[in-house]
Amino acid sequence: MCELIGILIPTTSFKRKWTTFKDTIFYQIYLQSFLKTYCSNYSYVFYLIVDDDDKVFSDSIIQTEIIKYVNQNKNLSLKFISTNGIPKGWVTKMWNRAFLQAYKDGCQYFFQCGDDIMFETKGWVHQSVEALKKHNNVGLTGPIDNGRFVNGNPIFMPGGARFIHTQAFVSRKHMEIFGT
């Protein structure tokens, strides 16, 4: 059986002119690049974290379309997670809610990220899993933000004094050690 990876993604159509799934950044950027770079030797569940009143993502017809689109790809599925009770914009609480659900669902690894990520490197999932396994599944890893290299000051790059790893890939041990 494939190792199961939970991908935790808050998203919103608030203040955006989207009316369909295919209008969204999640479809146009995230999914299109993910599908070109993911490792089909793993199984994935996207945990899409949405507001109950979101004009696009809470629409049941659009939700069905999103699930159908994702499910047509090898080893991919998707669940919607409600932000009910979480103050608007509190992304860490959103990630934590999805992390807990993914943990309960049996995911071995978790990737917290935004809906606007563009993946460029094939094999990034396998590299992330292997990096964690080398350290008994303790630690944090994930893909590099190439924009930092093109546009960034060296202090914001990996190893730099002000580097912040915002897209984190962790194992179940992270939850066992730190909780949500």
Language-model segments: what does each one mean?
Residues 4-5, 37-47, 76-78:
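Short loop->beta transition adjacent to catalytic acidic/histidine clusters or analogous donor-positioning motifs
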Residues 23-43:
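Short, acidic, metal-binding catalytic loop of nucleotide-sugar glycosyltransferases
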Residues 55-107:
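Active-site-proximal specificity loops/subdomain of glycosyltransferases
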Residues 9-29, 52-54:
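Active-site beta-to-alpha loop of glycosyltransferases that engages the nucleotide-sugar donor
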Residues 118-180:
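Conserved catalytic core of nucleotide-sugar-dependent glycosyltransferases
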Residues 107-118:
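Short beta-strand-to-loop acidic/aromatic patch adjacent to the donor-nucleotide binding site
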Residues 15, 49-63, 118:
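A conserved acidic beta->alpha catalytic loop
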Residues 29-33, 65, 93, 97, ...:
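Alpha-helical elements of Rossmann-like donor-binding domains used by nucleotide-donor carbohydrate transfer enzymes
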